[in-house]
From Swiss-Prot:
Keyword terms of this UniProt record: Cytoplasm, Hydrolase, Protease, Serine protease
Enzyme class name: hydrolase
PROSITE patterns referenced in this protein's UniProt entry, alphabetically: CLP_PROTEASE_HIS
Protein name: ATP-dependent Clp protease proteolytic subunit
Organism of derivation: Wigglesworthia glossinidia brevipalpis
Amino acid sequence: MNLIPTVVEKNARGERSYDIFSRLLKERIIFVTGKIEDYMANLIIAQMIFLESEDPEKDIFLYINSPGGVVTSGMSIYDTMQFIKCEVSTLCIGQSSSMAALILASGEKGKRFSLPNARIMIHQPLGGSQGQATDIAIHTTEILKIKKCMIELLSKHTGQSAEIISKDTERDRFFSGSEAVIYGLIDKVITCRK
């Protein structure tokens, strides 16, 4: 069962009820939660484009708690973040693993954060294929292209060399918030709002 809390706002004209995520969207906060897949990615993209149309000069805030997921779905979020005029601030709450770690790292420089006990994990893309040998070879070539692309993007956003990223993504590499700052995945660990 998926229960979503509601909030009630009162003003001079009466009351209005919102689900909590719609209310937070008014504050330009978008949640990236759970496995990244096409449906979820499309919702996030639609929210970013909507907020850009509302005010292209104001920041958008992505709150991330995700184990990662489908690379193409994550890349659609990544590409939209780069495409829109708004600066996108990212905050890891819980975990940002795999594709979610790239989304976290690709926030606006100086506006990439994590909470103190959040975990961040990078690794190479995962895949599997079956079928004829020719089809398996095609999929192998494609996943190697994706791996190269992911290494280049992580290198761009962290400042680490492609060689270091390649070595560090051979297996799961976990970071605490402070370790992620040193590595360049985020800019700061935050403990409270100011």
